[in-house]
Amino acid sequence: MAKTPEDFSATPDTPGDKGHPGTVDSAPLATRRRAQALAVCIAAAFLTLLDVSIVTVALPSMEHHLALSPAQATWSIAGYTLTFGLALIPSGRLGDEFGRKKVFLVGMVLFTVTGVLCAVATTATWLVVARLARGVAAGLVAPQVVGLLHQMYPPRERGRAFGYYGATVSLSTAIGPLLGGAILQCFGTADGWRWIFLLFIPLDLAVLPPALRLLPESRRAERRSSLDLVGALVLGLAVTAVMLPLLETGGWSGRRWWLAWTGLALLAVFVLWERSVARKARRPLVDLNLFRERAYWVGTLVAAALYGGFTGIFIVLFQFLQQGLHYSPFKASLCTVLFTLGSAACGIISGRLVHRVGRPLVIVGTACTALGLTATALVVGGSEAGDNMFLRMALPLLLAGCGAGLVIAANQTLALHRVPRREGSTAAGVYQTGMKIGTSLGTALASSLYFGQLLASHGDFSAAARTGLLGAAALAAVAFLVALPGLTLRGRRDGEAAVGAVQEVEPVG
């Protein structure tokens, strides 16, 4: 029979239940080995996330030397994001069913191979196809990273692990443009983009031996369930239809609206199908009882809105600084480094505090992010060509970055704290899919506002940047409003339950 809500609220870390045998995690790891395994997971997450930001800087070089059309140029970046998002939930289920370590290793091998294919691409089509495959590989790895952290750490220690994970997200976003700009400057624009992919390869390979040796095994307690292939297909079509309109350039034509509405309709079909599968006592692709946990679905919405907000600022600022103020990619990246440093530092701090402070960290963090982005928009809107933008934006971006860092680790810890370990990778896949959709929405919103205002103002880059950044700030404000009920009586009880879980529940693996 399908699980009841109590299966999620009462025993968040039980290995399974009678209806659906769960994942039996390996014995608890020694502290030193667990720290080493954490480093492996963080390294893999860093590489898959770095691929997005570092390649963006190389896009003009790839456009020129492979004769990419505008559509191909968009797909070389957006296609990676799309297939990354598509793979997250099915690969999360694969990890829960067949073992997170196995799926992690397969994903890293594929990520390495596709990096080689990108580096040696000789045509635009070759590059785009390799980028699509690379996104699938990254999507195989990402849910296993979170699932493994969920598996390796008892609840009272997960906040710290997720703090390091959140810092990794922030660092990869900022280091990518800096590193990409440095590589292009060192190797030249003709072949520099190839070196970006080539330098990934030894790093990817370096992750494999320690992963094979250190990562814990997970296995099914009884006979494996058959995979929900119909659910995977319907969900894949739904996510594609929702994300494609957000990733395409240009205005919102009738076709893009139809795609978006079709995607939402397919999501409804997916929910009905998953309920049908659960009623037949089979294992669905996504156990919908996850969404009976208020902390989980609220946390997923907060993550989607927040990632949409702070992703949008990079799109706008890089365009403004390079096109409007004629900064080099490297110099433009330096202007945003304080956001990253603040986010990384506060991510680690948040991970250490979440089990003592709870939900208020998310409230304060989203508020700081929204205020910081709004202040950045006002500063940029009043700027002139001779201004030192690093100094003008320093405090607002630092505030926004610190706010984002407070949210990332705390929100993920609170969202997943009552998820059973047997569902760890699947729950992470759903959570990260929400992040990807939010990221795509933020990119589309900020870009549309920026270029729309640029056209309307006849080339006023400052006004365009202000408008785009206000759009990003609006998404951060949405994250704040979604998280705000955490200060109500029920929200305080949810936070207390989270702390209670970390104090009482012992690890099984």
Give the ranges of each region predicted by the language model.
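Central cavity-lining transmembrane alpha-helices of secondary-active solute carriers
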Residues: 78-92, 138-146, 150, 337-349
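Membrane-interface helix termini in secondary transporters
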Residues: 61-63, 93, 97, 182, ...
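Helix-loop-helix hairpins in multi-pass membrane proteins, especially solute transporters
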Residues: 101-230
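Extracellular/periplasmic helix-loop-helix junction of adjacent transmembrane segments
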Residues: 58-87, 126-129, 330, 334-335
